[in-house]
Amino acid sequence: CAVNALLADGDVLYIGTERGLFIQKDGQLLQVQTDKNMLAACNRIMDLCLNEDKSVLWLATVQGLFSYSLKDGQINSWHFRENVPEADYFRCLTRIGETLYLGTMSQGVVCFDIPKQTFAHTVSLGCDVISDISGDGKETVYIATDGNGVHFLSHKDRKVVRRFFHDVNDKEGIRSNSIYSLLVDDRGA
């Protein structure tokens, strides 16, 4: 089955696939499904991240947001909007503090407040197709759009503080506003 996301944490590897979550630890491979039906859309895991104390694994799926407790295996789910086509669900996520930032195919970036367990929209980026999202873990969320370049969102102020976009007059600029992936190094560059 197709692998959509990998997350390494020490000697543990979390693998998000089209058929659920796989956890490789101590030479063993454990499969975890959000639904008993292997073909259910919620088993299509697009991205993964850990909470602050590494006790919960967050799963962005095409049918909502899921949490998987690494202590007891309990699975919980949240849905931003009910009865929305599969494309409106989550394809990427990152976390800063107690906030998850989730990229969607048609709703832009959505925030999830972990303690309050509530969703909210962030500012408009001029393109609601989010292809990748990353963060520095402290202050900045980096967002790639499929049509309006790259945006740097302030976690504290919830506004865009910088952006890169295609400009025909800038020969040194990016060549397209369709950006499909981001890689942020430990310096936030």
Model-derived regions, located:
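Carboxylate-rich, polar loop motifs that coordinate divalent cations or form catalytic acidic clusters
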Residues: C1-A189
